[in-house]
Amino acid sequence: MKNFWRKLIGSAKKEVNVEKNRQAKGKLNVNDLIYSYPDFIEAEKNGNYKNLKVFDKNFLEAKNKMLPKKIEISFLIDNSGSMDEEKIEATRKTLTATLLSIRDFNLYLQAHAQKTNQKIELVTETWFFGQDHYKVKNFEDVKDLEKNKIVSSITKVNNNLGTTDDASSLREIYKGISSKQKSQIKNKKEYKIIFEITDGASTFPGATKDIVKKLIETDVEIYAIQIGKISKIDTKTFNYIWNDNFRYPHGIILADDIEKLTYELIRLVKRNLQSIFNDS
């Protein structure tokens, strides 16, 4: 991952084609020739055109991309009663790898801020949801405290929250987006990304679909990954919430391929961060 992050930082600069006039070589600029006609006559007499700057020439120049000032990444973890030991262990492993990898990227980003010529704030938060929901890591957590909260996020996955009400936590995240932040997100000065890990469809699919739609309309990137055996009805419900009637799918069903969870989540994180750095 460190090589990927390094290349990503390097892509913050792009080469642009810039045309400059009054050059010694290149394509003849008629206006410059007319303006410098006395010099042209003198050069013709001497047979020396080296100092005659009447040409246009294209140059490749390095230019900093306009990157966002802030990137917020939220992780929502299913902590409902149906999360068995295999799912919990896979989620712990995935959360560990992803949060620590993002932390590495953030440290690398701050250390190489001069390469981007811009300061970018990259922050994460973690939510657990079930019958109820609560936050175990805030955006504001930094340095050693952040590391402690990352560990706390991992150890608190313990399937003690009953039903699967992800709508409530998503709604709270949506309510926390101010009008100013919505404008910043629309103008790509900020990015907000949400990743959810769940073992089934929401207990309240209509409510979840509505809030997912609102978040997408606000230009928030949101994705869900389903793990564990899933019924046909729950598959249909999951697709209704996350994939149906959207421009592109936002939900991935892994079912029994739980071992792919870490790969899929990190792939989504990488893809989203790559799109920010490459498309800016």
Please give the residue ranges for each predicted region.
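Acidic, glycine-rich A-domain
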Residues: 1-280
